[in-house]
Amino acid sequence: MPTGKLRQKPPYAAIMTNSPVTPSTETQQPKRDALYARFLPQEADAPPVEWLIAEGLTDYEEALAFMEARVQAIREGTASELVWLVEHPPLYTAGTSANAEDLLTPDRFPVFNTGRGGEYTYHGPGQRVAYVMLDLKRRREDVRAFVASLEQWIIETLAAFNIMGERREDRVGVWVVRPEKPRLADGSMCEDKIAAIGIRLRRWVSFHGIAINVEPDLSHYGGIVPCGISEHGVTSLVDLGLPVTMGDVDVALGKAFESVFGPRQTK
């Protein structure tokens, strides 16, 4: 993993929004840990979120086209909210804040420019991607609280396997402290990223989502500077010594989702 310093990122670096968000100063914004990280529907009779698990590997361009169509249908009221769980073949994606210098080996895997927020990340077999298509108007029109809720969903999922995932105010995503690894040059504890978040909002309907490393080939991250952060590494559940399957993670994701976002409906 390349070494270096954490670059300063603009606010909402993992978010791209076409929704009318009013900017506020840093002093006005509570820390994400202080936000109420539950995004339940406001209506008591709101329909459950559709929960769909794709089989095999999903082509990335097909996934983008599917999300675009579904978001439009949710906005028009002709489709329900949806969480779609997929795995992709090996690829890199570039968010709206990506720096070309962070793509270290451009010819290693296909590279897709995407409208989500954030920088470069990797998707591939052994990583569970959850595309989250929710209507925030039915919940809360609060982007930072939504990101905190996505982090909470991941944290509660990891807790099912006795893994303590943590937020970091300067880094969106979920992190695991690695006391068994050498400390950083400044003496701080080593931390590895286990889950990434990159979302986009269109008229308050979300798409893109989260990615949790279950058992991907972590060497594939060597072709990028993940999320523009070079001083911390990446890890996975299996890398942490847990013999879990994708099915195990899907069960934990489902239970934690209901805690944070409310009822879901499986097919």
Curated annotation (Swiss-Prot):
It comes from the Bacteria. Its main location: cytoplasm. Substrate binds at R116, G117, G118, E119, Y120, T121, Y122, H123, A196, I197, G198, G209, I210, A211. Transmembrane segments: none annotated. Its EC number is 2.3.1.181. The record marks K193 as: Lowers pKa of active site Cys. Residues 77-265 form the BPL/LPL catalytic domain. The active site is at C227. GO terms for cellular component: cytoplasm. InterPro entries: aa-tRNA-synth_II/BPL/LPL (IPR045864), BPL_LPL_catalytic (IPR004143), Octanoyltransferase (IPR000544), Octanoyltransferase_CS (IPR020605). Keywords: Acyltransferase, Cytoplasm, Transferase. GO terms for biological process: protein modification process. One of its GO terms (molecular function) is lipoyl(octanoyl) transferase activity. It is found in: Cytoplasm. HAMAP family: LipB (MF_00013). Catalyzes the transfer of endogenously produced octanoic acid from octanoyl-acyl-carrier-protein onto the lipoyl domains of lipoate-dependent enzymes. Lipoyl-ACP can also act as a substrate although octanoyl-ACP is likely to be the physiological substrate. Belongs to the LipB family. This is Octanoyltransferase. It comes from Brucella suis biovar 1 (strain 1330).
